From Swiss-Prot:
Name recorded for this polypeptide: Chaperonin GroEL
One Gene Ontology cellular component: cytoplasm
Higher taxonomy: Bacteria, Pseudomonadati, Chlorobiota, Chlorobiia, Chlorobiales
Binding site for ATP: T30, L31, G32, P33, K51, D87, G88, T89, T90, T91, G415, D496
Main function: Together with its co-chaperonin GroES, plays an essential role in assisting protein folding. The GroEL-GroES system forms a nano-cage that allows encapsulation of the non-native substrate proteins and provides a physical environment optimized to promote and accelerate protein folding.
EC number: 5.6.1.7
Complexes and interactors: Forms a cylinder of 14 subunits composed of two heptameric rings stacked back-to-back. Interacts with the co-chaperonin GroES.
Keyword field: ATP-binding, Chaperone, Cytoplasm, Isomerase, Nucleotide-binding
Gene Ontology MF term list: ATP binding; ATP-dependent protein folding chaperone; isomerase activity; unfolded protein binding
Pfam families in UniProt: Cpn60_TCP1 (PF00118)
Transmembrane spans: none
Record field: catalytic activity: ATP + H2O + a folded polypeptide = ADP + phosphate + an unfolded polypeptide
Main location: cytoplasm
């Protein structure tokens, strides 16, 4: 086991503070509409330019191990806030630095760290309650666009696109962000249920121009095994042919004689039919087939449930207004399933999402949820250079996350004003002793810091003057750093999701409290190069040298 280096008391806290300050000072220059960019060197490829706090924080590793521990603790604040709310990472970093700085002063003056922590915790609880009380719900497209615009660093194009996407697929719908092939940024909406399986044979194509199979008022056969024997498929094929409606066959696979017979009958005009493989694999495939069955009002023909393909009747078939199939995807539009069954399935998947502990499983469940809810929106992000594309894509992902947060918990005035107004909640915070009261006052002072930093980044106005003027106002009145005017910020579109502001404060206070109550810090001693064993002279041992 490697030898350790240990620092105690004020020595440990001072070193941690240096690390906290180095990281926070690099991150906080990005705060607000007047925030600056940070250029990050990449060992491979061009440097990355970003105005995203968590991206800056994740790049910082300090040489001194004790300083690095302080930096990593604050990096955790930014990361956790980003994971929970998608935005507010810079605000969280600024708050953590302010709470730790003010707390350290008091610890040095003799305050008990554990009482400071208790005071901080009580203060945060009351501030969060106050934030919730001043929060307002959003639903309109205009309000959603405002949140998206602010979170995308004041890019109205991105805000409008996100609002449009949410309008099309609903607030529970899946919105994915992808890199476009060209320079234009556009929104593409896939209506209905789409899965990534194309036709099994190009002979199923009904529209040679688009190379798509289009089935109107289609019947849908859903089978969870391979079909290789025509005999078991024949009864249901004859019944669907008599109805005169086109048939889509979804099965694990169709091969050999069965596929050849279907294709020949399609070419002769005897059958209107198309066949695709079932989506997904394993248990996920079973679940997706069940989703398709519920959406279309059909039944999954599965021997596990006691159903046999040769005994299938028309009652087992699902129905849809339209099915479009190309070589890669199948889209089922307007399935004829019962709405109450679809709603029950949606609620079941939502329950699974809440219980899921895996990010991958959660993502797949959300995709299934969106397909049942009515569609997937894809934001294709275009830019003139790769560096700009990556930066813009990251901003869109952040803005999308923050917009979802706003829909969940509502919005408050932006620009640091909501935190100033939430100071009122501290009147309800109780303290058992003077040190706890000091902890409450630390939060009172820290809540002003984001506004001070936003103003400082404009480089033209005195933070103390702005703070005093905002304090004297009421409600949503505050300083708009983009126009450098005092106005109603919500009316001006300067808003923050309540969840973002709340998460930033809670995470900052949590990590700053841990740092304040730290009495010792332990790290590995750096290996001294001088103590390393000398390399043996030329050649390899036992081989008398290599030539």
């Amino acid at each position: 086991m490697a030898a350790k280096d240990i620092l105690f008391d004020s020595d440990a806290r001072a070193k941690l503070k240096v690390g906290v300050d180095k990281l926070a000072n690099a991150v906080k220059v990005t705060l607000g509409p007047a925030g600056r960019n940070v250029l990050i060197d990449k060992k491979f490829g061009a440097p990355t330019s970003t105005k995203d706090g968590v991206t800056v924080a994740k790049e910082i590793e300090l040489e001194d191990a004790f300083e690095n521990m302080g930096a990593q603790m604050v990096r955790e604040v930014a990361s956790k806030t980003s994971d929970v709310a998608g935005d507010g990472t810079t605000t969280a970093t600024v708050l953590a630095q302010a709470i730790y700085r003010e707390g350290l002063k008091n610890v040095a003056a003799g305050a008990r760290p554990i009482d400071l922590k208790r005071g901080i915790d009580r203060a945060v609880k009351e501030v969060v309650a106050e934030l919730r009380s001043i929060s307002r719900n959003i639903s309109g497209k205009k309000e959603i666009a405002q949140v998206g615009t602010i979170s995308a660093n004041n890019d109205p194009e991105i805000g409008e696109l996100i609002a449009e996407a949410m309008d099309k697929v609903g607030k529970d719908g899946v919105i994915t962000v992808e890199e476009a092939k060209g320079m234009d940024t556009e929104l593409k909406v896939v209506e209905g249920m789409q899965f990534d399986r194309g036709y099994l044979s190009p002979y199923f194509v009904t529209n040679p121009e688009t190379m798509e199979a289009e089935l109107e008022e289609a019947l849908i056969l859903i089978y969870d095994k391979k079909i290789s024997n025509m005999k078991e498929l024949l009864p249901i094929l004859e019944k669907s042919a008599q109805s005169g409606r086109p048939l889509l066959i979804i099965a694990e696979d169709i091969e050999g004689e069965a596929l050849a017979t279907i294709v020949v009958n399609k070419l002769r005009g005897t059958l209107k039919v198309a066949a695709v493989k079932a989506p997904g694999f394993g248990d996920r495939r079973k679940a997706m087939l069940e989703d398709i069955a519920i959406l279309t009002g059909g039944t999954v023909i599965s021997e596990e449930k006691g159903y046999k393909l040769e005994n299938a009747t028309m009652a087992y078939l699902g129905q849809a207004s339209r099915v479009n199939i190309d070589k890669d995807n199948t889209t089922i539009v307007e399935g004829k399933g019962k709405q109450e069954e679809i709603t029950a399935r949606i609620n079941e998947i939502k329950g699974q999402i809440e219980k899921s502990t895996s990010d991958y499983d959660t993502e797949k469940l959300q995709e299934r949820l969106a397909k049942l809810s009515g569609g997937v929106a894809v934001l294709n992000i275009g830019a003139s250079t790769e560096v700009e594309m990556k930066e813009k894509k990251a901003r869109v992902e952040d803005a999308l996350h923050a917009t979802r947060a706003a829909v969940q918990e509502g919005i408050v005035a932006g620009g640091g004003v909501a935190l100033i107004r939430a100071i009122k909640g501290l009147e309800r915070a109780t303290a058992d002793n003077d040190d706890q009261k000091t902890g409450i006052d630390i939060i009172r002072r820290a809540l002003e810091e984001p506004l001070r930093q936003i103003v400082a980044n404009t480089g033209t106005t005195d933070g103390a003057v702005v703070l005093e003027k905002v304090r004297s106002g009421e409600g949503d009145y505050g300083f708009n750093a983009r126009t450098e005017e005092y106005e109603n910020l919500v009316d001006a579109g300067v808003v923050d999701p309540t969840k973002v502001t709340r998460s930033a404060l809670e995470n900052a206070a949590s990590v700053a409290s841990i740092l304040l109550t730290t009495e010792a810090a332990i790290t590995d001693l750096p290996e001294d190069k001088a103590d390393m064993p000398a390399m043996p002279p030329g050649g390899m041992g036992g081989m008398g040298g290599m030539y």
